[in-house]
Amino acid sequence: KSYIRPDAELELERVVRIMQKYPELKINLGSHTDSRARDAYNWSLSTRRARSSKNWIVRQGIDPSRIKAEGFGETELVNKCSNGVNCSEDDHQLNRRTEFVIVNPEVIK
């Protein structure tokens, strides 16, 4: 699924507020999946999730040139839950995430 969940909207609102406060701030947005589907599907899904997050932020008035969005599929798992490993739903959820990295932290004063 690549829609924005209500709990994710709260986090995206925080990002928007920070980007409004610091108009020169640029971010890289990286979306990740768990390992339960085929690698190619997960790559596509994470790309759609990244695009959805970026589009949501842009709809709030942030210039799209300030955001780079990229999907990583299941290439950067945060735990042992790779292909064929039996894990709980909570463990898989940890891998389904979007991370934000500030590209130019020097603009935050």
What do the PLM-derived regions correspond to, one by one?
Residues E9, G30-K109:
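Periplasmic OmpA-like peptidoglycan-binding domain that tethers envelope proteins to the cell wall
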Residues Y3-P6:
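Short, solvent-exposed loop/linker segments at the N-terminal edge
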